[in-house]
Amino acid sequence: MGLFSKKIHHHEAGQVDKSRLPRHIAIIMDGNGRWAKQRGLPRTAGHKVGAETFRKIATYCKDLGVEYLTVYAFSTENWKRPADEVSTIMALLKQYMLEAIDSMERDQIRLRFLGDLSAISPELQALVDRTNEISSHIHGFQANVCLNYGGRDEILHAARRFARDCADGAAAPEDLTEEGFSSYLYSAGIPDPELIIRTSGEERLSGFLLWQCAYSEFYFCDTLWPDFDSRALDQAIIAYQSRDRRFGGVK
């Protein structure tokens, strides 16, 4: 069975209007450590279950008709965590990249990694390159994994790239637009998320998609990430669909 093909219990969609789904849902997957602590388990156990939750939610998003799912897997600040926890997260990433390489084409799911990938191991970088190569031949649902990612870091990285282009004569400051600047971001080519979800009861972005979230709707829930399921996602989508999105105007 493939990385994203594991079946979950599907329920009636209830009030979800499939004609008004967000194209792009982004999730801050928070609460793995607390989930483990509540059960007397090491934090690493929470990350293992949380990785499985990601696979289930990605499959459900694809089946529902969402086009893009972006998750915050590892931030630029997460290197400060205990070494064994960081090692476990990196080992999980390696495991799921290997599984993805074997199943992406069969499951028709593209996988893209966003962030400063120069800081990860050469082995993981090679696996990222391989998943990118496979994804280039797939059309359809795309799962984006933010790895060694920080919103401010992304904007600085984009600004430096633009500055280099200006110095080389390939760009001019007076010609820069929001759309043009977006092309320098890690997320270039991906539409901004309409809905951003954070689990575990925390109500902050923690540097997630700071440029892209200008008009996103935010949804915060108390559910810890390992317990987040298709019903919880439906509730978030229903809340999103109940809102009046004006984009700075009036109706």
Locate predicted features:
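Flexible, compositionally biased loop and terminal segments
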Residues: M1-K251
